[in-house]
Amino acid sequence: MLAELFGEEDRARDMATRLAELARKSRESASAERKSLLAFLRGPMERHFVFEETRIFPALDEHGLGPEVQVAIKQHDALRQLAEKLDSAMPEDDVAQLIFEVARLMLHHTNFEGDYIYPELTHEDWRRLMKETVVSEGKATP
């Protein structure tokens, strides 16, 4: 799951960069990405958020990073709320602007975690998380 976690971070960053640029250039093209963005937010990104919230963030809390964890959780919640707004947007709503907002927050969030929060975990912390992930995935497999 940890390898997937970082892969999803990279995918989110790449997608956000592409969508932000697309929203600046063509509202129609950005709006055409609505369904694929929602599928990404509700699939891979939601799994990513849940994994962080249940596995990574408790370890960060142990390192005294509670305030930073709360910022990341607020960003997760904001992205979930934007996904809801995007899903319920009406034809007269500015879908391209919503997509731009999602992209901007995804970029900010992935940079916040990748550049500031994740480096606070030691090599040993990551090893422990990997072991726990393997054990928990082994229990979940029939």
PLM segments and residue spans:
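Small-residue-biased structural context
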Residues: 1-142
